[in-house]
């Protein structure tokens, strides 16, 4: 595993937030702002802060601490955010797990990332995640206080929200009658501490895992948000799952950095997504080309009022002055899991390119990375 932008003595310039505890402290200035809106949930920043603090206390009481590897397996929902924040704010190394992964692949991820504790939901869009864990770990035995799984030898507890009748599932952690130590633990979390293991999609090879520190990923998301002009008045829709770097950096952490709201669903469906965008007055749409095209081709597209949209990747929803005359004049970017998301971006995002910059991927994102072009054989700079 490779750290993307970590350094032994990480420092954060210009007063930028340097860790998840610092981001949460920033959001307390506007506690009532909406953090997440789904088809059936609303979660404010204050609610996420309170709920994750309680879960953090419970995790500490169970033995989770700095460096403990905590897997997160939920759809894009409030409990994903609460669980991830709870583990991250006390210094645990979070391991977001793919809800796309079938049993065999999920088992490999659990073993490869040395997960010790899993926080998970029962299902996603009607598909049973509990059965998938059982498929992933056929040798899973035991129950409280610990479990044993030969396929994932470090795994000791699996917590299923809100409950589960499997013998190996532990009751969801409760903060009742435990010491309140999370705030003290937060004081021990710094920018150089590991925050998250992000696993690649595995499109061209076996999925690989990348470790990012608090300082590297929080700073990256903060700079991205400022460069794109995201603010607390924005409402960002994206079907990108929170467990991949796009959803984590471009959606979850940008919302925490700015106070913007996240609009999300269990699964993408063009008609219901268009209804969500109109109802919740989305301002940014960040999605893959296939999802954009599916919405543009849907019969409801012409009926929906998307006049609130001011930026993003769905050309058909952009205001006329931000819509390029030709598709290849739409600005693009380059990104990698290893760089925590985009590492290039045009100087004025979400606006058409001039013809002389057709197909440009922009410039190295200021304050994030430096680029060099080298001969791959000799290593000599071009």
Q: Where are these predicted regions, by residue range?
A:
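Gly/Ser/Thr-rich phosphate-binding loop
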Residues: 279-287, 291-358, 363-370, 378-379
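Conserved pre-ATP/AMP-binding loop-to-beta segment of ANL
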Residues: 151-152, 160, 170, 174-199, ...
């Amino acid at each position: 595993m490779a750290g993307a932008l970590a350094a032994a003595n990480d420092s954060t310039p210009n007063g930028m937030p340097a860790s998840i505890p610092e981001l949460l402290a920033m959001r307390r200035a506007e506690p009532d702002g909406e953090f997440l809106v789904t088809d059936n949930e609303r979660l404010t920043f204050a609610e996420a802060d309170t709920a994750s603090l309680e879960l953090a206390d419970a995790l500490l009481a169970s033995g989770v601490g700095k460096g403990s590897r905590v897997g997160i397996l939920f759809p894009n929902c409030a409990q994903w955010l609460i669980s991830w924040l709870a583990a991250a704010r006390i210094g645990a190394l979070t391991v977001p797990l793919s809800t796309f992964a079938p049993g065999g692949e999920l088992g490999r991820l659990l073993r490869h990332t040395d997960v010790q504790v899993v926080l998970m939901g029962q299902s996603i869009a009607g598909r049973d995640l509990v059965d998938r864990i059982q498929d992933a770990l056929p040798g899973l035995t035991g129950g409280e206080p610990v479990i044993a799984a030969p396929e994932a030898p470090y795994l000791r507890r699996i917590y299923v929200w809100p409950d589960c009748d499997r013998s190996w599932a532990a009751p969801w952690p409760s903060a009742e009658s435990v010491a309140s130590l999370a705030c003290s633990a937060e004081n021990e979390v710094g920018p150089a501490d590991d925050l998250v293991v992000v696993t690649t999609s595995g499109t061209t090879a076996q999925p690989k895992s990348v470790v990012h520190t608090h300082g590297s990923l929080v700073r990256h998301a903060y700079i991205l948000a400022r460069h794109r002009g995201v603010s607390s008045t924005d409402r960002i829709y994206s079907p990108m799952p929170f467990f991949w770097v796009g959803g984590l950096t471009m959606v979850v952490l940008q919302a925490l950095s700015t106070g913007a709201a996240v609009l999300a669903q269990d699964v993408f469906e063009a008609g219901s997504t268009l209804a969500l965008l109109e109802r919740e007055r989305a301002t940014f749409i960040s999605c893959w080309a296939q999802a954009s095209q599916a919405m543009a081709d849907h019969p409801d597209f012409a009926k929906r009022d998307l006049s609130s949209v001011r930026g993003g990747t769905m050309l058909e929803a952009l205001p006329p002055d931000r819509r390029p005359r030709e598709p290849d004049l739409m600005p693009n970017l380059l990104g990698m899991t290893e760089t925590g998301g985009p590492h290039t971006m045009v100087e004025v995002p979400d606006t058409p390119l001039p013809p002389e910059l057709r197909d440009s991927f922009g410039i190295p994102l200021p304050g994030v990375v430096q680029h060099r072009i080298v001969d791959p054989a000799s290593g000599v700079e071009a």
